[in-house]
Amino acid sequence: ALGAQSRTLVVCNPPYGRDGSALTSHSETTRIARHEGGLSPEELARAAARLLRSGGRFCVVYPAPRIYEMMRAMDDCRLAPKRIRTVHGVAGRAPKLVLLDAVKDGGSQLHWLEPLVLRDADGEYTDEWRRIYRMGAERRNG
C-alpha cells in the first residue's frame, strides 16, 4: 500500500467520460478505461493530495471542457495549479485536453505554457509532436 504523504510526484491520465453522458461500450474493460465510474475529479484530487508530501507535484491530463471541475477539486485539496498547457488536435481549433501541473501547498501563481498542437491546418503532424512521439518511442525501445 502507498503511505500518506509518501510521494513527491503523482501522474494521472484518468478516464474522463461521465457515466451515462458519453458513448457506452459493451466491453467492461473499455468502459472502465473511458468512463470515470467512481473516480470523480474530487476523489482523484483527494487521493493525490493524500499521497503527496508538501511541495509534491500532481500532474494530470483532463478534458478541456471539464477543467474547471478538476481545478476546483485541486483547490479544495490544497493542490495549487502551477503550469497549464492546452492540447489542440488541430491548429486553430479549440483544445480537447489540458495538461495540469499542480503543487501541494504551492501558492497561487499559475504559468500558462504555449499550446501543444498535434496537427497543423493541413493535417500534418507538427514538429513538436513528432519530437515528443519520437522521444517516447526511443525510451520504450531502449
Protein language model regions, located:
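Mobile active-site "lid"/loop adjacent to the S-adenosyl-L-methionine
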Residues: 5-9, 14-43, 47
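Solvent-exposed, flexible loop/coil residues
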Residues: 6, 20, 36, 43, ...
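Short loop/turn elements that flank and shape the SAM/SAH-binding pocket of Class I
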Residues: 1-2
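Residue-level preference for alpha-helix termini and adjacent loops
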Residues: 15, 22, 31, 86-89, ...
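SAM/dcSAM-binding transferase cores
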Residues: 94-142
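Short, flexible active-site-adjacent loop segments at beta-strand->alpha-helix junctions, enriched
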Residues: 13-16, 64, 106
